[in-house]
Amino acid sequence: MRTEYCGQLRLSHVGQQVTLCGWVNRRRDLGSLIFIDMRDREGIVQVFFDPDRADALKLASELRNEFCIQVTGTVRARDAKNVNADMATGEIEVLASSLTIINRADSLPLDANHVNTEEARLKYRYLDLRRPEMAQRLKTRAKITSLVRRFMDDHGFLDIETPMLTKATPEGARDYLVPSRVHKGKFYALPQSPQLFKQLLMMSGFDRYYQIVKCFRDEDLRADRQPEFTQIDVETSFMTALQVREVMEALVRHLWLEVKGVDLGDFPVMTFAEAERRYGSDKPDLRNPMELVDVADLLKSVEFAVFAGPANDPKGRVAALRVPGGAQLSRKQIDDYGNFVKIYGAKGLAYIKVNERAKGLDGINSPVAKFLTADIVDAILERTGAQDGDMIFFGADNKKVVADALGALRLKLGKDLSLTDEDKWAPLWVIDFPMFEDDGEGGLTAMHHPFTAPRDMTASELKTAPEEAVANAYDMVINGYEVGGGSVRIHNGEMQQTVFGILGINEQEQREKFGFLLDALKYGTPPHAGLAFGLDRLTMLLTGTDNIRDVIAFPKTTAAACLMTEAPSFANQAALTELGIQVVKKAENN
């Protein structure tokens, strides 16, 4: 039906007769001439109808936005004064000789000239996806997956599918369950990741595996989370953590070079402890120049319990955050930031305004100045590198609260005061995570997942001191987003059972949930390691949007619903009966 795409016409096509198919993006009726901007997935081209082709001109008068049409015409160069430098096709136009209206369009529920609500965009997603910026994002996503497949194929990885209907495993979120008609009362789980299957593939001898795969997690949603999402899933045998990181770093550098024309360079490596200490986060945004600086040793003797208490507590921390130019902040802004850190458990926000650095105590403004000596102020200013016009905020509490509160404040200030370099790319690896963390109920939970191996520990050493264990794990972070994470896996049955035991999974439960894995570990399991990237999040970064729904064709809302199809929906009673399921209605309060 067509010979060319609208958006691909150039000066090289001048004089050629072309047939185009697409939609009316805009129509301008000048009486004797009608101009339309005609759009397809590749872009927009100007088409005009003149009196010499009366039939086409008459039909063109009926055109309205989003009519689906076919146009045949001749490509012409525009006069110099009419060249549109803002359009890829701005040097040419098409003189139409014939027009076919394939399908007309009703009045549109979306307004192309205004910002539409996200609710409207998701309800009429098929119209929203016609917008050039949305089409471009999905084209970029397709390019990314194509680049990934070629790269992985070139590096000896095999694309192997794993099951969608599987068994529930503990991976940190609730499973989506699928009832079995054949096995009444039993349920499949949709996979949160192909974790165990890819490990089993390593045990089967497929030493380099990858898959671009759907995963499912029934968890509370955020702007960068979806109940169904796509992973670039990778696993290898006989490779060290460093070797895995090198290959995966090469993949990501390849993506940025091909999609953005940017060489990310070598990725710096930072331990979890250093990231938390310096940035208050295990996924630090290195585009932001501010860092947390420990000052507890300077404040142990002050007569101010807010500082002295945490400064003298082994589990406490007092840290400072220097904000370049922050002395300009108003009292209201400071109060607003004080309320902001309370979200993260902080009780408030002490501060020092640095007016004249050289004057020390006499050159600052601070509600806590009366508790500080000149020597202490000089030491704080020296350690933080404060300059005239800076602000120093303090966090004083237990280590987690200080890291969370000042880490979040650092990001907010970086954005509010334009301190974060938005034109920069800042990738890094974060390694050496704690293997376990407190579950809040007196037990331990795996920081990554229960199949991650510890670094340099035997099973007996791990059992004796699990709190000291460091996971052989690694996360890739870009501009403050965790885009991928992985680890060296446990390939020894004794170690795996030890980890299960530490997590409170007894032997009977181990056999019920992971018997197949424990059996497989008995038969010459190779050392193996892997990683998974979030394709949606990578695409979000590479297309410059901060909303993951912008890079998924048909996403869910933050309530895990599809406004277009109205999923989820109630099942009919016959289907429920066949599955042996009875819906229990919630009792209404009178």
Curated annotation (Swiss-Prot):
Its main location: cytoplasm. ATP binds at R217, D218, E219, Q226, E482, G534, L535, D536, R537. It catalyses: tRNA(Asp) + L-aspartate + ATP = L-aspartyl-tRNA(Asp) + AMP + diphosphate. It is an enzyme of class 6 (ligase). It comes from the Bacteria. Keywords: Aminoacyl-tRNA synthetase, ATP-binding, Cytoplasm, Ligase, Nucleotide-binding, Protein biosynthesis. Signal peptide: none annotated. Disulfide bonds: none annotated. Pfam families: GAD (PF02938), tRNA-synt_2 (PF00152), tRNA_anti-codon (PF01336). GO terms for molecular function: aspartate-tRNA ligase activity; ATP binding; nucleic acid binding. Transmembrane segments: none annotated. Homodimer. Belongs to the class-II aminoacyl-tRNA synthetase family. Type 1 subfamily. PANTHER family: ASPARTATE--TRNA LIGASE, MITOCHONDRIAL, ASPARTYL/LYSYL-TRNA SYNTHETASE. This is Aspartate--tRNA ligase. It comes from Salmonella paratyphi C (strain RKS4594). The lineage of its organism: Bacteria, Pseudomonadati, Pseudomonadota, Gammaproteobacteria, Enterobacterales.
